[in-house]
UniProtKB/Swiss-Prot annotation:
Gene: psbN
Bilayer topology term: Single-pass membrane protein
InterPro entries: PSII_PsbN
Function: May play a role in photosystem I and II biogenesis.
A single Gene Ontology CC term: chloroplast membrane
Biological processes, Gene Ontology terms: photosynthesis
Protein name: Protein PsbN
Protein's organism: Hordeum vulgare
Keywords, alphabetical: Chloroplast, Membrane, Plastid, Transmembrane, Transmembrane helix
Transmembrane annotation, as ranges: 5-27
Length: 43
């Protein structure tokens, strides 16, 4: 394979991995530990 193809696949893989981790953190098990600043300031 060419170098440009490998770089493109690597960057795409990193982007997909980061997006998956962000979605897991936002909506998966760790989301229960996140604090809600709007709930803390119940005006």
């Amino acid at each position: 394979m060419e170098t440009a193809t490998l770089v493109a696949i690597s960057i795409s893989g990193l982007l997909v991995s980061f997006t998956g981790y962000a979605l897991y953190t936002a909506f998966g098990q760790p989301s229960q530990q996140l604090r809600d600043p709007f709930e803390e300031h119940g005006d």
